[in-house]
């Protein structure tokens, strides 16, 4: 069984037992969270789509870790104008382990 969930403005296809890195969720390590925004649920060749959400469906997950992605380097430059700008960015993430899908 799998589900498509929406969290942090993005959509993820998840199944029980998988690990997943999502946008940062303010929760302690080891805390159990519920993802309520389930867009689709599937098992085998049967799929149930929501309009926009599947009613009564939820995904239970456990927070494994909180961390930061690798640095992304941004470099802007205007030719012949002696303008250069360097910037870096590290996005925070939360790593989840999917425990169960309730449909």
Swiss-Prot record:
Disulfide bonds: none
PROSITE patterns recorded: RIBOSOMAL_L21 (PS01169)
Entry function: This protein binds to 23S rRNA in the presence of protein L20.
Alphabetical list of InterPro entries matching this protein: bL21-like, bL21-like_sf, Ribosomal_bL21, Ribosomal_bL21_CS
Name listed for the protein in its UniProt record: Large ribosomal subunit protein bL21
Protein family (similarity comment): Belongs to the bacterial ribosomal protein bL21 family.
GO molecular function terms noted in the UniProt entry: rRNA binding; structural constituent of ribosome
Biological-process GO terms, alphabetical: translation
Spans through the membrane: none
Pfam families for the chain: Ribosomal_L21p
A GO term from the CC aspect: ribosome
HAMAP family named among the record's database cross-references: Ribosomal_bL21
Superkingdom of the organism of origin: Bacteria
């Amino acid at each position: 069984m799998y589900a498509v969930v929406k969290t942090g403005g993005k959509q993820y296809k998840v199944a029980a037992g998988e690990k997943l890195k999502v946008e940062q969720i303010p929760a302690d390590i080891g805390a159990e969270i519920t993802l309520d925004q389930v867009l689709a649920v599937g098992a085998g060749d049967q799929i149930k789509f929501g309009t926009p959400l599947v009613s009564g469906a939820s995904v239970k997950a456990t927070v494994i870790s909180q961390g930061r992605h690798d640095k992304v380097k941004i470099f802007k430059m205007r030719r012949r104008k002696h303008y250069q700008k360097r910037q870096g960015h590290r996005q925070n993430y939360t790593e989840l382990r999917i425990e169960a899908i309730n449909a």
